[in-house]
Regions:
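Cleavable N-terminal export/targeting peptides
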Residues: 1-25
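Short strand-turn segments of transmembrane beta-barrel domains in outer membranes
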Residues: 26-31
């Protein structure tokens, strides 16, 4: 096992050993492009977090295990730098992903963004950058939100941007999302998340 992956594993074990009030977050996504995503993260009372997610598209199945810390420069804003060990099923992919999670809620507006950079350690998968996703929404009535969803995947100097409308329905367990994004590959995406305190 490479030294960076050992360091990330140790960080996750240390963070996982802390005691305190916790918050679990689960999310499942799917799309007509055969995109699939499963995420579980655990945030401690001290804002340290552990995150594990799987993302798959045709020809790629990637597992990410990492963690980080959430900073709140303002009560409405959370910035969470994250580091992941990345293992891909195909092409003997191994690497590190450095990411930034941004969450903002203010006066009915909500912004959520995950921006990441994958750095290859071994295997045949090139370095890449990903925005998955940038969602901007506004509460319009009760549990309903409308907004805009944007994302991209950049590898080998080639971009695959997607942009389009977003609709969201909140309930006591989390939220349902649907977005219709346009770009080189149009995508109808569905998502469900759960938040447990």
């Amino acid at each position: 096992m490479h030294t960076p992956i050992k360091a990330i594993t140790l960080l996750i074990l240390i963070l996982g050993a802390r005691q305190g009030l916790a918050q679990h977050y689960l999310e499942v996504r799917g799309a007509d492009t055969k995109y699939r995503y499963f995420d579980w993260n655990y945030t401690f009372a001290n804002s340290a977090l552990v995150d594990m997610f799987y993302v798959g598209v045709p020809g790629s199945n990637e597992f990410n295990l990492g963690g980080g810390y959430g900073f709140k420069p303002k009560p409405c804003l959370t910035l969470a730098p994250l580091v992941y060990a990345v293992i891909g099923k195909e092409a003997e992919q191994r690497g590190i992903k450095i990411a930034l999670l941004v969450m903002l809620e203010k006066e009915g507006w909500k912004v959520n963004s995950f921006l990441g950079h994958f750095e290859r350690i071994s295997g045949d998968v090139d370095d890449y950058q990903v925005l998955d996703t940038l969602d901007v929404s506004r509460v319009v009535h009760g549990p309903f939100e409308v907004g805009f969803s944007s994302g991209f995947f950049r590898a080998g100097g080639k971009w695959n941007p997607q942009n389009g409308p977003l609709f969201k329905l909140n309930d006591r367990l989390g939220a349902w999302y649907v977005s219709w994004r346009f770009g080189p590959d149009n995508e109808l995406r569905f998502s469900r998340n759960f938040l447990f305190k």
